[in-house]
């Protein structure tokens, strides 16, 4: 492999690659989406060179295929990211991310009076983008929050 084509992070045989993550968001994605709880090997690159972003983060998860729904939840933090499905070291599918209609079980509602804090229910937020601002509305208390406030509370 020539120096120009050398990978910055080791290739995987089977699994998922989350690419084009804005620098600094990789750790947040690993924590919020509980990716580090898998028993599979995860390879992470932080602040890698990127022509489009300047710097980017990259996450490779072996033997795990992220679904389109799971991939789209990442759009809250990395709207321009792609999720590549890898088989035998080759990309067999690419997910271009879109904001999901809803997201469940990932965040806690910031409203301390929300019933979701005291009942055994998964969090559920309806996701909307209005004038370039992503807002998440809790199903239970019906309060809306920007995604950065919701993620800070987790």
UniProtKB/Swiss-Prot annotation:
Source organism superkingdom: Bacteria
Pfam family, one: PyrI
UniProt entry keywords in alphabetical sequence: Metal-binding, Pyrimidine biosynthesis, Zinc
MF-aspect GO terms: metal ion binding
Binding-site list for Zn(2+): 109, 114, 138, 141
Bound cofactor: record note: Binds 1 zinc ion per subunit.
One annotated Gene Ontology cellular component of this protein: aspartate carbamoyltransferase complex
Its job: Involved in allosteric regulation of aspartate carbamoyltransferase.
Family to which this protein belongs: Belongs to the PyrI family.
Subunit structure: Contains catalytic and regulatory chains.
Name of the protein: Aspartate carbamoyltransferase regulatory chain
Organism field: Aeromonas salmonicida (strain A449)
């Amino acid at each position: 492999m020539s120096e120009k084509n050398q990978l910055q992070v080791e290739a995987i045989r089977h699994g998922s690659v989350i690419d084009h993550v804005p620098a600094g968001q990789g750790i947040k994605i690993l924590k919020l989406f509980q990716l580090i709880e898998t028993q599979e090997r995860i390879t992470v690159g932080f602040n890698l060179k990127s022509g489009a972003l300047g710097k980017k983060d990259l996450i490779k998860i072996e033997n795990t295929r992220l679904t389109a729904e799971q991939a789209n939840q990442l759009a809250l933090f990395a709207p321009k990211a792609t999720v590549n499905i890898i088989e035998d070291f080759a990309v067999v599918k690419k997910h271009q991310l879109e904001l999901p209609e809803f997201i469940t079980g990932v965040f806690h509602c910031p409203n301390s009076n929300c019933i979701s804090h005291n009942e055994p229910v998964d969090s559920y937020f309806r996701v909307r983008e209005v004038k370039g601002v992503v807002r998440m509305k809790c199903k239970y208390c019906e309060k809306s929050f920007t995604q950065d406030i919701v993620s800070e509370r987790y």
